[in-house]
Amino acid sequence: MACLSISERAFELLHSDHSYYLDLKKHIERLKNKDQTPYTPAIPLFLALREALLMIKEEGLENRLKRNEKLANATRKAVKTLGLKLFPDENYASNTVTAINYPEGVEDKEFRNILKEKHRVIVAGAQSHIKGKVFRIGHMGICSFTDLLATFGAIEATLTELGYKVEKGSSVGAIADFM
């Protein structure tokens, strides 16, 4: 699902070579004339979007953005406390996700597998030229400090199991400072 808008000029330039279901011109014309979609949409996606928007409205957009920033700052502090390096440089860091370079000797698939299988924590890998070199932690949406505490507790245990020296509880303590 995607929310989008296009200019009148872009609408005029829409060509007739299209797929049946993703016929953007047909969608727009149907919405203008009948206020509905041309085909049966994925109703659960609309309901999920509605719920997500209601949650943002309830929390307040500014509060949501501030919370995401606070979670991002706590994540970055926890990463540094473990002696790990951020990717990219912190000046370019996002408040939606944090990428972390693996320490030398820690292998991506093994690290993420242990996190998932032993601790039920999933972190994302990377793509392209940094695939296998970094992992990513998301901290937006309904992510909470409780989620971060559990994630970093699992990261500490996994790094320790893989032979990387970690001061037990250090990253969790760093996160607690932001709560």
What are these regions (language model features)?
Residues 129, 133-179:
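PLP-dependent enzyme catalytic core of the Aspartate aminotransferase-like
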Residues 6, 100-104, 139:
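Short beta-strand-to-loop capping motifs
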Residues 1-77, 81:
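Active-site C-terminal subdomain of aminotransferase-like
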Residues 83-87, 121-126:
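A short linear hydrophobic-aromatic micro-motif
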Residues 90-92, 128-131:
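A short beta-turn/loop motif at secondary-structure boundaries
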Residues 45-48, 52, 64-67, 71-75, ...:
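General structural feature for long, well-ordered alpha-helical segments within catalytic domains
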Residues 85-118:
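Conserved PLP-binding catalytic core of the aspartate aminotransferase-like
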Residues 115-123, 156-159:
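A common structural junction motif
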